Design a protein with these regions (language model features):
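Histidine-rich, glycine-flanked metal-binding segment
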Residues: 1-29
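Divalent metal-coordination and catalytic microenvironments
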Residues: 3, 25, 36, 44, ...
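Hydrophobic "anchor" residues on beta-strands that sit immediately upstream
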Residues: 18, 32, 90, 182, ...
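Hydrophobic/aromatic beta-strand patches that form the interior of the parallel beta-sheet core
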Residues: 19-21, 33, 114
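N-terminal capping/lid subdomain adjacent to the active-site entrance of alpha/beta enzymes
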Residues: 29-32, 37, 85, 89-91
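Histidine-centered catalytic micro-motifs
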Residues: 31-42, 182-191
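Alpha-helical scaffold segments that flank or form the walls of functional sites
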Residues: 45-111, 134-147
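Metal-coordinating catalytic core of metallo-dependent amide/deamination hydrolases
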Residues: 102-223
Length: 224
């Protein structure tokens, strides 16, 4: 009933008229959870394959992602949702933008999800609240709170150390703490990223830096 299995047995309960499934020679397992994804990138699979991470991001992914329309994001998310369902996943944790359109795909597919907009520092912008990432995150937070819906949850996204700075990181941590939200971030994907962070921040690794600015004072998912 709703999103709950209410009965497992060998006989149909008297008077029950809802859905039933034949479980002979099968096993019932909890759904898998994809802990880190960028579901609209399903459309870009294989694009720029073989490039080092930072060239792949700056030469291929970031420029292409910037051109994705709302419809692109929705249908790519629907394709990704089909792949999740086929593989036994019931929920996923995502970092992207145009959150409303990913949310629509989540609802239309019947999945669950945690959604976040991974903020990156931009010239001319100061605090986190000046960013589109904040506006989308806060709008989704308010909408979900009003709906009382637990199928979709919102997290606060920080793209990575190398696309951020200390002030923005602290702002993200403060907002997550004030709003009672989780943080979703990329931790340390490559040796290059790791070593350059130490050079920029007086020997601190990405993990140590994130801890210092308070990002690990709230529940956090640190992806690769």
């Amino acid at each position: 009933e709703g999103n709950r299995i209410v009965y497992i047995g060998t006989e149909r309960p008297e008077g029950y008229t809802g859905e039933t499934y034949d479980g002979r020679n099968k096993v019932a397992l909890p759904g898998f959870y994809n802990i880190h994804w960028h579901i609209p990138d399903t459309l870009l699979r294989g694009y720029g394959e073989g490039l080092p991470l930072h060239r792949w991001l700056t030469e291929k992914m970031f420029p292409f992602e910037a051109k994705l329309t709302e419809e692109d994001v929705y249908w790519s998310s629907m394709l990704g949702a089909c792949e999740l369902i086929r593989s036994g996943a019931a929920s996923f944790n995502d970092m992207f933008y145009k959150l409303e359109w990913i949310e629509r795909a989540v609802r239309d597919s019947g999945l669950k999800a945690n959604l976040s907009f991974g903020v990156s520092a931009l010239p001319g912008l100061g605090s986190y609240r000046e960013y589109a990432a904040y506006a989308e995150t806060e709008a989704l937070r308010r909408r979900l709170a009003e709906a009382g819906d637990d199928r979709v949850r919102v997290d606060v996204g920080l793209h990575a150390e190398y696309t951020s700075h200390g002030g923005l990181m602290r702002d993200v941590a403060d907002y997550a703490r004030e709003a009672g939200l989780r943080v979703h971030l990329h931790l340390s994907e490559t040796r290059k990223e790791h070593e350059e962070c130490k050079t920029r921040h007086n020997g601190l690794t990405p993990a140590a830096l994130f801890e210092r600015v308070g990002l690990f004072d709230v529940p956090a998912i640190a992806a690769h």
